[in-house]
Amino acid sequence: MSVLEKPKKTAEQDWHRADILAELKKNGWSLRSLAKEGQVSYNTLKTVLDKSYPKMERLVANAIGVPPEVIWAGRFAERNKRPTLQHKY
């Protein structure tokens, strides 16, 4: 079987940032109000949309009512990935 014939693994996708913001708004939150409630700065909370930040991920997920593993499935898959050991010789 060649490389082109191998089936690709389907990776879980993270939610799009607009979807996260829309869900927050549906639940009565803005990033600024959530940051104030969580006693963190707005800029700190905003970084969760682009970078991995477990504490802020939990804050956003709790406000939406969905586990962070669902919202950022790709990040959690990367965190929980075990390296495969290969013989060098």
UniProtKB/Swiss-Prot annotation:
Gene behind the chain: nlp
Keyword terms: DNA-binding, Repressor, Transcription, Transcription regulation
Name of the protein in question: Mu-like prophage FluMu DNA-binding protein Ner
A GO molecular-function annotation: DNA binding
Superkingdom of source: Bacteria
Pfam families noted in UniProt: HTH_35
InterPro entries (UniProt xref): Lambda_DNA-bd_dom_sf (IPR010982), Ner_HTH_dom (IPR038722)
Function: Negative regulator of transcription starting from the Pe and Pc promoters of Mu. Also negatively regulates its own gene transcription.
Family membership noted in the UniProt record: Belongs to the ner transcriptional regulatory family.
Upper lineage: Bacteria, Pseudomonadati, Pseudomonadota, Gammaproteobacteria, Pasteurellales
UniProt DNA-binding region: 57-76
Statement: the UniProt record of this protein carries the keyword Transcription regulation: yes
